[in-house]
């Protein structure tokens, strides 16, 4: 699925086609959509396909005036009739060039939803570096939110486990521990990527960008 958004009159709004200063949002793109991103919009094929590999690791690289930032995004999904929440991560590619910014990921997620629905204030899609950093900040904030949820669920489930010793609670505890491993690994690799960006060699940072990036790093370290 491909959608296009642009900040109009201070609000992120959906538009019908690519424009300078817009945000191209690709969620589980079909092969024709991938070809459109590569052949028509001129994005690097390896950059576009990077986030379509579940095992892709966080990194930042640049190629012919395009910059790729790969980070893991935390996810939370209910998977059974008893509404057990399963926490995991998936890669997201953020690609910038001199015209627009593109995000690519395998599934819809809370970060993309918040941004596309205009729920995040002060988003300017034409300020590509600032927008990229705001995406990273929302990801870091979402990690913190989910970690707090995991902590709360773990506490409640452990108390139930002591009282009932049922398999359900034991399975949930094991699932939460697995989620924490995913999150820990993702946050460590994301922190390394952010430190590379902070050096300013791949992405040009202005003073305001540096301050925003430092806020992102603080959030990641807290998580």
What residue spans do the PLM features occupy?
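Peripheral, non-transmembrane regulatory/ligand-interaction domains of membrane transport proteins
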Residues: 1-222
């Amino acid at each position: 699925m491909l959608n296009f958004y642009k900040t109009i009159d201070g609000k992120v709004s959906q538009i019908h086609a690519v424009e300078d200063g817009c945000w191209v949002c690709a969620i589980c793109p079909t092969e024709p959509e991938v070809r459109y991103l590569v052949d028509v919009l001129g994005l690097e094929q390896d950059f576009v396909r990077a986030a379509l590999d579940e095992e892709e690791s966080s990194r930042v690289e640049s190629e012919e005036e395009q910059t790729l930032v790969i980070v893991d995004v935390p996810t939370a999904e209910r998977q059974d009739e008893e509404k057990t929440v399963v926490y995991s991560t998936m890669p997201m590619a953020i690609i910038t060039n001199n015209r627009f910014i593109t995000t690519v990921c395998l599934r819809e997620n809370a970060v993309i939803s918040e941004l596309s629905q205009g729920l995040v204030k002060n988003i300017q899609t034409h300020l590509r570096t600032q927008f990229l950093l705001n995406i990273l900040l929302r990801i870091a904030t979402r990690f913190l939110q989910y970690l707090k949820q995991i902590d709360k669920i773990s506490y409640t489930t452990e108390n139930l486990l002591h009282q009932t010793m049922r398999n359900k609670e034991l399975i949930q505890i094991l699932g939460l521990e697995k989620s924490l491993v995913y999150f820990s690994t993702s946050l460590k690799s994301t922190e390394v990527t952010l430190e590379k960006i902070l050096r300013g060699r791949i992405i040009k940072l202005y003073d305001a960008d540096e301050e925003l990036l430092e806020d992102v790093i603080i959030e990641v370290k807290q998580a």
